[in-house]
């Protein structure tokens, strides 16, 4: 049994903070992107699936690591044989060992007493040999060739183009061009007053505080006047 006199709960003056839900980006500008947009995915996930990017600069962190991004399932990738949970260093250098060894005949000069190789005869290019190793010329430099970073996936030449990218390219190629901006009637009247008073002296137009209250620069006024004069000539 509870107490007879319950203490009234004082209302706190601190407002409750409610966490906002994830914002859903509505794509209203481009109908092709809006048609393939998935509201259940984030902006980065949608852009990655559509083959787009929200920024042209290199990612500096916070990028979601996926198997497809690391190229683990790509047989042509240098990391195809590494497990998905591997924590290999991103700067590991992968070198391809030669599968077959080319047989080559060389003429060598031996010591008549010990039979040791003194030098290789007929070698076109002399390689560095600081330790005076007589077999230094037989080393194959192909095994030491740098093949890039391990984390960078390699793509083939016949990579399939994303259908969304193909639609966007066709729309950009065959789409209507944006009409140039037309000057309003008030802008034309303002330019007409400037030209009537100063002619082609754009420096005095820019310094006039009454006729140029928005402090447009000399170059901007000149560009507007040239455009206004061209429109007047076409209408005549």
Curated annotation (Swiss-Prot):
It is found in: Nucleus, Nucleolus. Keywords: Nucleus, Ribonucleoprotein, Ribosome biogenesis, rRNA processing. InterPro entries: Ribosome_biogenesis_Nop16 (IPR019002). GO terms for biological process: ribosomal large subunit biogenesis; rRNA processing. Pfam families: Nop16. Residues 1-28, 206-236 are annotated as: Disordered. It comes from the Eukaryota. Its main location: nucleus. Residues 8-27 have a biased composition (Basic residues). GO terms for cellular component: nucleolus; ribonucleoprotein complex. Disulfide bonds: none annotated. Transmembrane segments: none annotated. Involved in the biogenesis of the 60S ribosomal subunit. PANTHER family: HSPC111 PROTEIN-RELATED (PTHR13243), NUCLEOLAR PROTEIN 16 (PTHR13243:SF1). Component of the pre-66S ribosomal particle. Belongs to the NOP16 family. This is Nucleolar protein 16. The gene is NOP16.
């Amino acid at each position: 049994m509870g107490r007879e006199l319950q203490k009234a709960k004082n209302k706190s003056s601190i407002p409750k903070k409610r966490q906002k839900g994830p914002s859903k980006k509505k794509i209203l500008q481009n109908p092709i992107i809006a048609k393939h947009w998935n509201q259940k995915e984030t902006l980065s996930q949608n852009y990655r699936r559509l083959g787009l990017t929200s920024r042209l600069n290199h990612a500096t962190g916070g990028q979601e690591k996926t198997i497809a991004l690391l190229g683990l399932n790509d047989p042509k990738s240098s990391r195809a044989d590494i497990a998905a949970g591997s924590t290999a260093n991103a700067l590991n250098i992968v070198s391809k060992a030669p599968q077959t060894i080319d047989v080559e005949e060389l003429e060598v000069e031996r010591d008549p007493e010990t039979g040791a190789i003194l030098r290789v005869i007929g070698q076109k290019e002399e390689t560095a040999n600081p330790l005076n190793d007589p077999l230094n010329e037989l080393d194959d430099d192909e095994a030491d060739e740098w093949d890039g970073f391990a984390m960078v996936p390699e793509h083939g030449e016949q990579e399939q183009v994303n259908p969304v990218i193909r639609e966007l390219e066709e729309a950009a190629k065959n789409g209507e061009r944006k009409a140039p901006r037309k000057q309003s009637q008030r802008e034309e009247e303002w330019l007409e007053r400037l030209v009537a008073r100063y002619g082609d002296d754009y420096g005095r137009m820019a310094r006039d505080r009454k006729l140029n209250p928005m402090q447009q620069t000399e170059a901007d006024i000149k560009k507007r006047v040239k455009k206004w004069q061209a429109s007047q000539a076409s209408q005549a």
